Amino acid sequence: LVFEPYAYEALKTANEKILGIEGLPAYHMDKADVLVSLGADFLETWLSPVEYARKFKAMHALNRGRKGFFCHISAYQSLTGANADLWLSCKPGTEAHVAMGLVHQAITSGRGKNLPESLLSSIKQVSLPFTKEAVVLASGISAENFDRTATRLTTAKKPLIVGPGSACGNALQTNMAVNLLNLIFDPQLMLFDFEGRHRVETAARRSQVLAFFERLNQEPVDLLLLNNTNPVFSMPWESTVIEALKQKRLFVVSFSSFMDETTALADLVIPTRLPLETWDEYSGRRGMVSTLQPAMGHLTEAPSIGDVFLCSNGGKKPDNYTKYLYRHLKQKKKFETTKAWAQTIQQGGIFKQNHRTPSFQPPEIEPVFFHKAFDNLLLPSTSELAFMAVPSIRFFDGRGANRPWLCEVPDPLTKIAWQTPVLMHPQTMKTKGFAQEDMVEIQSETGRLNAPVYETEGVHPGIIVMAIGQGHQNFG
């Protein structure tokens, strides 16, 4: 079971429902002339930030007197939003309303005529309620900015729209609407790379992870191996992860170099080499192999996890993980000769350009499916104050929070180091009577936390935002 807290479930499901592909294709962002992001923080935590930072730079660079236009629509301004030509602050959860409003505008302007007639008719019918007036009222963005974004899209030659990766209100519907927009503007999806799909698509769904730990509580399992994963911290408090790990009949082995919340419950802890201490390979995308080598030597006597498994294999060949890795990649025909292997090591992997299949055809979708998805979109919260926990550029989901240098590095937007403040709009602060650096307590059914207030216009009024990552109980 592959556990990844950010498993992009909404994005994968939307791709399955609209595109007929349950996976995470890559995007040729560098080839777009207009880019619209609805909560996709691709410069920080979304899919492959290093890859998309490079592609965004190419898309946004001045070329022959022109540069691409980038609009970011979200409830708070992340680093990605701060780099946008236009940031639209919307109420949390209304990104789907905005996306469907853009669908309605695109259809009204005559786009989408190359789509199958039945599909175009269904999209047109389901988008009727999402007029500009309705979207502006629901989302809180201005009519002027909505028109500006819609005009940019409808006049673009190669527009690309991307949706949120992390769970949020109406995330599935947002990503479905995003896929519809891309189909309307380009039925062949030429800016999608279906061959070079992101490997994180192999991550298990949250329901599968919960069911896995439920089975551990009910079935006679006697051994559980955990490799550098911390579900106790990342899974919801009401899940049965802790109960499963505390089962007396279950022997838990944690391969980890740090004592995190999950490792603290293990019966046996086996520290393993860090990535810069060992030979290994990782394929972040299909068709790509990135090689690791012990550039730092061996900092400790800890073994690589590959050698641990080979030792438990009864002494069968190969006798170490380096030889196994060589044989494994050769059997997969990644190279043929020892010289080719040396070249692979020198260049850090095997990188072949992927080309998408040019014969993509939109699947047939029943009209009733669209109505089930979009007729009952959740409206914005009517509570006086809404709380958003968002991925952290410094700590990701919390797995980097024990690195002192990451704590010491200031957040790129707030310039605050060592701690995580609560971001609050000046209007909200005035209403609540808060001042800069006031300590506030945030309380829910599962716990409470205290944090200082940071005033910023980069969040929508009526919400407070805090980055995920700190707050560990065990993570040395």
Stretches with model-predicted labels:
Residues 1-24, 176-206:
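Anionic-ligand anchoring segments at beta-strand to alpha-helix junctions in alpha/beta enzyme folds, i.e.
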Residues 4, 37-40, 45-83, 197, ...:
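A cross-kingdom feature strongest in bacterial/archaeal respiratory oxidoreductases
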Residues 9, 54, 82, 96-105, ...:
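Residues on a specific face of well-ordered alpha-helices
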Residues 16-33, 90-95, 109, 207-220, ...:
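A polyampholytic, Gly/Pro-enriched intrinsically disordered region
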Residues 29-39, 43-50, 58, 62-160, ...:
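Long, well-ordered, tryptophan-enriched scaffold segments
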Residues 77-83, 126-131, 155-162, 189-193, ...:
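Short acidic (Asp/Glu) and glycine-rich catalytic loops that position anionic groups and cofactors
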Residues 137-141, 163-170, 197-201, 228-233:
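Conserved short loop/turn motifs at secondary-structure junctions
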Residues 304-328:
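Non-catalytic, well-ordered alpha-helical segments in soluble enzyme domains
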